[in-house]
Amino acid sequence: MSGYTPDEKLRLQQLRELRRRWLKDQELSPREPVLPPRRMWPLERFWDNFLRDGAVWKNMVFKAYRSSLFAVSHVLIPMWFVHYYVKYHMATKPYTIVSSKPRIFPGDTILETGEVIPPMRDFPDQHH
C-alpha cells in the first residue's frame, strides 16, 4: 500500500490550513504596531517643543546647551573632585601638596605681613 490514508490526508490538509492561517496572522496591518505614547522628561519636552520649527538660531542655542552640559558634567565636576581630593586629603608621603598650617601663638610674627599677634585678653571675672 502506497500513499496516505484518508485520515492522514485530512490531517495534513488541516495542518497546512492551520499553517497558512498562522502565517497570515503574522502579517501586520498598516496600523500595527500600536506603540504607547512615549513619556518624556520635562526638559526633553521643552527642547522638543523649542526645536519643532527648525530655526537655525534655535539649533545653535541647543548645541551650545549640549556642549556646556558636556563641559560641566565631564570636565568641571571631575576637576572639582580632583581639586577637593588634592586639597583636603593628605598623602602619606612627606612633602606632599597639602601641609598643615603651623599653630599661631600670642607674640608670634606672621612672615608674609610682618604682623605680630597680640597677647590674649584676660577676663578676670570669668573662670576658665
From Swiss-Prot:
Coiled coil location: none
Entry-linked Pfam families: NDUF_B6 (PF09782)
UniProt similarity note: Belongs to the complex I NDUFB6 subunit family.
Record note on quaternary structure: Complex I is composed of 45 different subunits.
Annotated compartments: Mitochondrion inner membrane
Organism: Mus musculus (Mouse)
Major place of residence: mitochondrion
Sites bearing N-acetylserine, chain numbering: 2
Top-level lineage group: Eukaryota
InterPro entries: NADH_DH_b-subcmplx_su6 (IPR019174)
Gene: Ndufb6
GO annotation terms (biological process): aerobic respiration; mitochondrial electron transport, NADH to ubiquinone; proton motive force-driven mitochondrial ATP synthesis
Function: Accessory subunit of the mitochondrial membrane respiratory chain NADH dehydrogenase (Complex I), that is believed not to be involved in catalysis. Complex I functions in the transfer of electrons from NADH to the respiratory chain. The immediate electron acceptor for the enzyme is believed to be ubiquinone.
An example Gene Ontology CC term for this record: nucleoplasm
N6-acetyllysine carried by residues: 24
Key words of the record: Acetylation, Electron transport, Membrane, Mitochondrion, Mitochondrion inner membrane, Respiratory chain, Transmembrane, Transmembrane helix, Transport
Regions crossing the membrane: 64-86
Membrane topology: Single-pass membrane protein
Protein name, entry field: NADH dehydrogenase [ubiquinone] 1 beta subcomplex subunit 6
